[in-house]
């Protein structure tokens, strides 16, 4: 069983955990907080009303340019979405490797 009580996932953890959780029927969503999409990654733009529409228990992985901004805002995200899991993408958009796969 995956530990979902962590603050950050690396890109490889995100990709592996996304696959494992989706096999269990859990939605894992990459959330763009900077209006700057990651090339080759499927993500939604941060929009609280839209995010709240996801099923309870969904996992949101928030990213910014460096990962520091979303990491520092985790308390805010978790209070806004108490029925969802909120995690920050370590290194953010800057550390994303387009060709990385697991």
Predicted regions and their residues:
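Conserved beta-strand segments of alpha/beta enzyme cores
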Residues: 29, 40-42, 85-87
